[in-house]
Amino acid sequence: MTMTDPIADMLTRLRNANQAYHDAVSMPYSKLKQGVADILKQEGYITSYDVTEPAEGEVGKTLTITLKYGRNRERSIAGVRRISKPGLRVYAKHTGLPKVLGGLGVAIISTSQGLLTDRQANQKGVGGEVLAYVW
């Protein structure tokens, strides 16, 4: 069965695994999902991610994300929200890039220069599609 919105599926898997205090979560691989995982890692929301090749008899690579928790199992991801959806795309110019929780969170932007955070896109002076907010 095909997936209508793979990024929403990824964010939902992350949110659910985080709420259940799982150590890791696996999902089907795509370059876009790897880019989102890379941003989450560089911003400190996850520990790491790993791309595994399919075993014999399986189809497609798998992306495994290792979640990050504090000393007393405090969640590093308080919330995740999908902004631009297949039925309603949301774009922003570099002058109108959103601030998530006054700069405490991060907006993931798909630009002509690849996936960037709202801060990186603002520094480079590029706008794009606002994929998600993470805080």
UniProtKB/Swiss-Prot annotation:
GO terms for molecular function: rRNA binding; structural constituent of ribosome. SUPFAM superfamilies: Ribosomal protein S8. Disulfide bonds: none annotated. Keywords: Ribonucleoprotein, Ribosomal protein, RNA-binding, rRNA-binding. One of its GO terms (biological process) is translation. The keyword Lipid biosynthesis does not apply. GO terms for cellular component: ribonucleoprotein complex; ribosome. One of the primary rRNA binding proteins, it binds directly to 16S rRNA central domain where it helps coordinate assembly of the platform of the 30S subunit. Part of the 30S ribosomal subunit. Contacts proteins S5 and S12. PANTHER family: 40S RIBOSOMAL PROTEIN S15A. This is Small ribosomal subunit protein uS8. It comes from Nocardioides sp. (strain ATCC BAA-499 / JS614).
